[in-house]
Every structure is written in C-alpha cells, then in structure tokens.
C-alpha cells in the first residue's frame, strides 16, 4: 500500500485548484531547473541542481540518466540513496491530482538501486536497498530490499534470496 496524504477538494477537479496547493513561482522555478537537468550530460551538475534548487535528497555517486523527470510540484519529497542509478526517461512522482482529491507522498529510493529506463514511480512508495527495477515498470507499491521487479502492474520476479542464488550459480 502506498503511503500518501489525501487532500479532498470540492467543486472543480483537484488539478484545477493546483495553485492553491503549490505556489505558481515554485512550479516555474522547478520547471526551469528540471528542464536544465534533464538535458545536461553532467551527472555532478544534475545532482547539485536537484539538491540545491529542488531540495531533493541525493546520495553520493548517484546517477540520473538523461531525461529523468522528478516531480515538478513536490520534488523535496524525493530521496535517493548512495550509488543508485535512475534510468533514462524515468518519472518520479510525489503527487497525483484526481477528480475529488489530490495526494502527496514521499518517494524513498535506497542505496545501490538500479532503475531501468522509462520507469514510472508513483507517490508514497519505498524502493529498498539493492533492488533492481526492470525498464518500463510502473512502481505502484513498495519494493523489498534486493528484489528484482518488473512489469505493469509491477510484480516481484526474484526475491533478494533468489537473486543471491542466481548470482552464486552464475559465478560457478
């Protein structure tokens, strides 16, 4: 189950009320910073931009590939551990606007996690240390430490123990 805070709205849908939930100038600033970071090939610069201007928590030696799209409204709710790779064109959401409510949730990505290209991570999930997320996955629930997951809907392909056994066999 994803951990999100629910905020009901009345009248028009929640996205119609967007600037009552997040300041307009914050969105403009975040948009500009994210667009610069999406296209720059300099990983150190991306991490600096994310930490400095978006207030994201980004661990040492973490790499964001080209075109990664962190949440534009609430990037400060995203935390990425050390020595993690976020694959090309991955989207990390910390919010979702629905018809009668909007939801906000932290996204916690552990240490030494590998996230494949074109993955979408929904708000309120935790991806455990050492996990591997296959390309094109919709991460809609927590991922256990060391697990290999993939698909839409996401499912566990190998547990941490099964992954260790596979690595052991391939080394023989």
UniProtKB/Swiss-Prot annotation:
Recorded GO MF terms: acyltransferase activity
A Pfam family it matches: Hexapep
The EC number(s) this enzyme carries: 2.3.1.-
SUPFAM superfamilies with a match to the protein in the record: Trimeric LpxA-like enzymes (SSF51161)
Keywords: Acyltransferase, Repeat, Transferase
Keyword set includes Repeat: yes
Main EC class the enzyme belongs to: transferase
InterPro entries tied to this protein: Hexapep (IPR001451), Trans_hexapeptide_repeat (IPR050179), Trimer_LpxA-like_sf (IPR011004)
Family, as annotated: Belongs to the transferase hexapeptide repeat family.
PANTHER family, alphabetized: ACETYLTRANSFERASE, ACETYLTRANSFERASE YVOF-RELATED
Stated name of the protein: Putative acetyltransferase YvoF
Source organism phylogeny: Bacteria, Bacillati, Bacillota, Bacilli, Bacillales
Protein's gene: yvoF
